[in-house]
Amino acid sequence: IAKTLVAIAIPVVTSSIIFSLTNLIDAITIQNRLDGVISNNLDLIKSIYATQIAEAHVLDADLKDFLYGAYTLSLDFKNLIPSITTTLGVSAIPALSAAYAVKDKRALKSSVESVLRVGMIISLASGIGMGVLAEPILRMFYENGKSAPAISIAAPIMAAYGYTIFLMAISQPMTNMLQAVGKANVPVKSLTVGAVVKVVANYIFIGIP
């Protein structure tokens, strides 16, 4: 039993570590690339965000922090939908484990399809709403605060998250279900590939003004 638990626990823990490290590396690479692109294209960046910079009275030395702060406004809402769909995967673990133990493929298929169907409905509907209403939502929370000038920068980012959030919203339930049927090593591989792709994409695309 101990060996089985360890065999299951190691991939699960590894997945969590990779996810946390990816978020950390993501934050570091974004800020580093922002610093580089601003240093090399200061006048262009200032012309693109002239209105917001003037409204917030941003100095050249603070421009990177201002733009990164605008990006983080959208992050406040990014995890709302995945946090809901994650509970679907967790709630399905007992049924999936039981069906897998007795090799009931029909029950296994039914459980997986139900979780994915409900997860897609929730994530697509709420994601589209998040995309369409990105700026009104941000204004509702930040209109009267110091972050108000950054709303027009954060809104397109939040909209992009909204339209693609179903991918993130489905990934966690799928991870839970794979772990429930003894395939915990699969999420480790996919997370590793995703982390590498994300870091490379950050480096390439953030460097483009």
Model-derived regions, located:
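Interhelical loop/hinge segments that connect adjacent transmembrane helices in multipass membrane
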Residues: 1-16, 37
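Interfacial transmembrane-helix starts/ends
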Residues: 2, 6, 72, 92, ...
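Alpha-helical transmembrane segments of polytopic membrane transporters and translocases
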Residues: 43-59, 65-85, 117-121
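Residues that define the loop-to-transmembrane-helix transition and helix capping
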Residues: 69, 155, 184-185
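Helix-loop junctions and terminal segments of transmembrane helices
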Residues: 74, 85-102, 175
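Residue-level recognition of pore/gate-forming positions within transmembrane alpha-helices
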Residues: 76-79, 114, 127, 136, ...
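Interfacial segments at transmembrane-helix termini and the short loops linking adjacent helices
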Residues: 131-165
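Membrane-interface junctions at transmembrane-helix termini in multi-pass inner-membrane proteins
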Residues: 163-193, 203
